[in-house]
Amino acid sequence: MNCCWCTITTNKLEESVVFYEEVIGLSVARRFSPSPDTEIAFLKDNRGFEVELLKNGRPTSDDLNGISLGFEVESLADTLALVKSKNIFVFGGPTKVPGCSFFFVKDPNGVSIQLIENDH
């Protein structure tokens, strides 16, 4: 079994696409509108995992506690500098634990994003 994507329902599609491209480093794999009130963008990493951004006009929840997505980065210091340059609030870390270092930000939809640099 292979986890192929996660879906985030959003009312901020354009802002979300920019976040996942510029901060996380994903690239748009495909984008389409299956119906007049629905737009979908899939953003992909270099290993094939995708984030599906779904805008369908329905209300989104502000209660996203307990949900987070983790993304491995090459350099935590460089990623932290990028995040700060974009005025994105860091709400946890940077923290060093055995095997890795990480910090947390929120995407435009309030989803917690953990950015991780594994020790090599």
Identify the role of each PLM range.
Residues 1-15, 67-71, 119-120:
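N-terminal beta-strand motif that seeds the catalytic metal site of vicinal oxygen chelate
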Residues 1-2, 61-66, 96-97:
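Short glycine-enriched loop/turn motifs at secondary-structure junctions
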Residues 7-48:
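Core segments of cupin and vicinal oxygen chelate
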Residues 19, 77-82:
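Short amphipathic alpha-helices within nucleic acid-binding modules
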Residues 31, 42, 80-120:
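Vicinal oxygen chelate
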Residues 40, 50, 70, 102-104:
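Short hydrophobic/aromatic beta-strand element in the GNAT-like acyltransferase core
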Residues 46-50, 60, 75-78:
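Short, charged/polar surface micro-motifs in flexible loops or helix N-caps
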